[in-house]
């Protein structure tokens, strides 16, 4: 119930105005967001790499219906990749980028669901980013958003992967369709990130309880880990980390990776990396941090309590 209410708040402009102006908001945001500039993102990536961690960077922003903004977001990624390459951070895919299709034009053409014009624009911008990533020695993961964009996002990823095989895609265990998608994507060389999902979805499309989502995650995890692809297991849940570790014992070294969010269980990230596991940290940056913050609060109620205490103390 609390999680669904917070997800609804992520879409509320009134709540957004209150939260973004709150004196305690910035301190909480700084735990999870690298900063607002590409220089901030590069600095955090450099720091994480020095600790033996891999990185994926996400320029915050989504649901754009402005063609110029979509193009500007693509340009931001291209410039970021150039800066990362200049510092030697992209070698071997050590630092890659994650891109939300709606940030680069998927919803252009009107409405809340993708249309052909938006799919075409997003594909063109994503191809530009993928080429820049390839030239920098790294790759791109096409992020997942709410269920209305899933078919279009997978279609774009499949199209790009036919020419750029390292392009990754993301599946959300909260969606009822995901186990079938996992079976289809468990193919040689396919990079698939499995996460729980962080969007408010209708019950017809998604599981509602944490227990159901966890069970779905475990089923999808087993499908991906048994396949010939490259699973990227995005979870902080100790039980799911343990299941992943158990399934990974029989696999060749380096054939899968863990992924965790910047600022969430950093000690566990380093512990896993020190044990020899590949661990990639998902690092967002940019000024459009509100929805990202709300999703993090929804996932971890303790963070919500901390945030509310901070607001009261600084009011």
What are these regions (language model features)?
Residues 1-315:
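Positively charged, amphipathic and often flexible ligand-engagement surfaces
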């Amino acid at each position: 119930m609390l999680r669904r209410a917070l997800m609804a708040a992520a879409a509320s402009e009134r709540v957004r105005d209150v939260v973004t102006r709150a004196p305690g908001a910035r301190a909480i945001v700084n735990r999870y967001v690298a900063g607002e500039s590409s220089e901030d993102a590069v600095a955090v990536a450099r720091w994480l790499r020095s600790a033996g961690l891999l990185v994926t960077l996400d320029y915050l922003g989504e649901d754009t219906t402005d063609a110029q903004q979509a193009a500007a977001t693509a340009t931001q990624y291209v410039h970021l990749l150039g800066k990362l390459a200049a510092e030697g951070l992209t070698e071997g895919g050590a630092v890659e980028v994650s891109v939300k299709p709606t940030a680069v034009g998927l919803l252009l053409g009107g409405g809340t669901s993708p249309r052909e014009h938006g799919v075409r624009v997003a594909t063109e911008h994503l191809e530009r980013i993928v080429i820049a990533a390839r030239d920098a020695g790294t790759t791109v993961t096409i992020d997942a958003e709410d269920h209305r964009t899933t078919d279009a996002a997978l279609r774009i990823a499949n199209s790009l992967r036919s020419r750029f095989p390292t392009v990754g895609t993301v599946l959300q265990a909260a969606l009822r369709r995901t186990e079938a998608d996992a079976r289809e994507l468990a193919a040689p060389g396919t990079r698939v990130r499995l996460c729980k999902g962080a969007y408010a979805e209708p019950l017809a499309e998604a599981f509602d309880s944490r227990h159901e989502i966890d069970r779905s995650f475990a089923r999808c995890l087993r499908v991906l880990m048994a396949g010939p692809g490259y699973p990227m297991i995005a979870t902080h849940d100790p039980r799911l980390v343990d299941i992943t570790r158990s399934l990974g014992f029989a696999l060749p070294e380096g054939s899968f990776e863990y992924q965790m969010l910047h600022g969430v269980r950093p000690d566990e990230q380093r512990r896993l990396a020190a044990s020899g596991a590949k661990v990639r940290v998902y690092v967002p940056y940019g000024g459009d941090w509100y929805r990202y913050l709300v999703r993090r609060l929804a996932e971890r109620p303790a963070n919500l309590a901390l945030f509310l205490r901070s607001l009261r103390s600084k009011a």
